[in-house]
Amino acid sequence: CELVDLALLFGERLTEKKREKNLLDFEDMEHLALQILLKEEENGQMVPSDTALEYREQFVEILIDEYQDSNLVQEFLLQSISGEDDGRFNRFMVGDVKQSIYKFRLARPELFLEKFATYQKEDGSCVRVDLKQNFRSRHEVTDCVNDLFLQLMHRELGGVEYDADAALYPAAQFPEADGE
């Protein structure tokens, strides 16, 4: 297919130009990190490298903010340095799938949704803590957001059902605004 050939040629030329100018983009750095932290076994399976295992021993916990914007490469990087395949669940992930904004960077909000669906609310090796209290906004704002998302967000559209568990509840007290 001509389009595929053109895309491959463009990729090769872009890589050449970046090498000539000693440039790396974010994606290049992710893939270089993969080469360092993963190795291929004889059977073709990718496993953590010795470097990844060294990091694994150093990291007691791995904190990830905005997890809903992670992509598969980042997930593989995190898996390589966390202890999950050793039975040590040491990742602390924070995110809100309703805020996923990096599809252009191949973000996979379904990674977040998978963990959201499988982690328990209490007890167990992987615990999910739902933060429903909003300390930033007045109730007029959270009420509006809740009403809008209740109408728009469904499992088929955003991967999450917007219900009482997903809603925001105002927790801060604000002084009354002038003109009310």
Where are these regions (language model features)?
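Conserved helicase NTPase motor core
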Residues: C1-E114, D130-E140
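Short, polar/flexible loop-turn hinges at active-site or ligand-entry regions and domain interfaces
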Residues: R19-K21, N43-P48, I101, Y119-V129, ...
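Non-catalytic alpha-helical coupling and interface elements of nucleotide-dependent molecular machines
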Residues: L38, I64, G83, A117-K121, ...
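Short helix-terminating capping/connector loops at secondary-structure junctions
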Residues: R56, D86-R88, E122-C126, D178-G179
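Helicase-core coupling region on the C-terminal RecA-like lobe
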Residues: D130-E180
